[in-house]
Amino acid sequence: MSKSRLTVFSFVRRFLLRLMVVLAVFWGGGIALFSVAPVPFSAVMAERQVSAWLHGNFRYVAHSDWVSMDQISPWMGLAVIAAEDQKFPEHWGFDVASIEQALAHNERNENRIRGASTISQQTAKNLFLWDGRSWVRKGLEAGLTLGIETVWSKKRILTVYLNIAEFGDGVFGVEAAAQRYFHKPASKLTRSEAALLAAVLPNPLRFKVSAPSGYVRGRQAWILRQMYQLGGESFMQQHQLD
């Protein structure tokens, strides 16, 4: 290998190492800070805002209204757990059984990809990472998930998740969603309303809370049944999530 190539390789290696250190400090600081402080914005919110500006939409504003867990109806937390991650109180960020099932399903159905991200993984991704699918992003997501699972309580993870989740175009967080769709604060959401909000989470830009399709209504009904089977509000109390 020539001297010039060695110089370039050495420069790239040093740059990547420094970048990794900077990102580790940035993300580590974010995990520590947001373990106690309200989250003002997320990576997904920033991505949506920049995308809107690039497309000439300067009226678009991505924001969320932070609320603590005692300002959120217990039905809402239960609804997203029932819909997205029923083993949330038990695992350390990853549901291995669901991952194995998703991999097996995706091998058989390449055109219908199934995910297996837990609430913890979704929180890490939405808060710190860009949208999309790649092994690099998945690797970073895994590290960030371990970080928040180590530093944050389950209640804190759920609180942050509910405050940064996307419920529609420009609608981030359960407080903004409750006000937009039901004209009430998140603390007043009913069991049915919470299930409807949770029903659009797989794809909130495609599925509409304001005009729910038959699929969304069916998913809402399924979530309501799962909420009942989990034990209702007592589930949240039992796992100290309320």
Swiss-Prot record:
Keywords: Cell inner membrane, Cell membrane, Cell shape, Cell wall biogenesis/degradation, Glycosyltransferase, Membrane, Peptidoglycan synthesis, Transferase, Transmembrane, Transmembrane helix. It catalyses: [GlcNAc-(1->4)-Mur2Ac(oyl-L-Ala-gamma-D-Glu-L-Lys-D-Ala-D-Ala)](n)-di-trans,octa-cis-undecaprenyl diphosphate + beta-D-GlcNAc-(1->4)-Mur2Ac(oyl-L-Ala-gamma-D-Glu-L-Lys-D-Ala-D-Ala)-di-trans,octa-cis-undecaprenyl diphosphate = [GlcNAc-(1->4)-Mur2Ac(oyl-L-Ala-gamma-D-Glu-L-Lys-D-Ala-D-Ala)](n+1)-di-trans,octa-cis-undecaprenyl diphosphate + di-trans,octa-cis-undecaprenyl diphosphate + H(+). Gene3D superfamilies: Biosynthetic peptidoglycan transglycosylase-like. InterPro entries: Glyco_trans_51, Lysozyme-like_dom_sf, PBP_transglycosylase, Pep_trsgly. It comes from the Bacteria. One of its GO terms (molecular function) is peptidoglycan glycosyltransferase activity. GO terms for cellular component: peptidoglycan-based cell wall; plasma membrane. The chain crosses the membrane at residues 19-39. Pathway: Cell wall biogenesis; peptidoglycan biosynthesis. It holds the Pfam family Transgly. It is found in: Cell inner membrane. Disulfide bonds: none annotated. It is a single-pass membrane protein. The keyword Transport does not apply. Its EC number is 2.4.99.28. GO terms for biological process: cell wall organization; peptidoglycan biosynthetic process; regulation of cell shape. Its main location: membrane. HAMAP family: PGT_MtgA. PANTHER family: BIOSYNTHETIC PEPTIDOGLYCAN TRANSGLYCOSYLASE (PTHR30400:SF0), MONOFUNCTIONAL BIOSYNTHETIC PEPTIDOGLYCAN TRANSGLYCOSYLASE (PTHR30400). Belongs to the glycosyltransferase 51 family. Peptidoglycan polymerase that catalyzes glycan chain elongation from lipid-linked precursors. This is Biosynthetic peptidoglycan transglycosylase. The gene is mtgA.
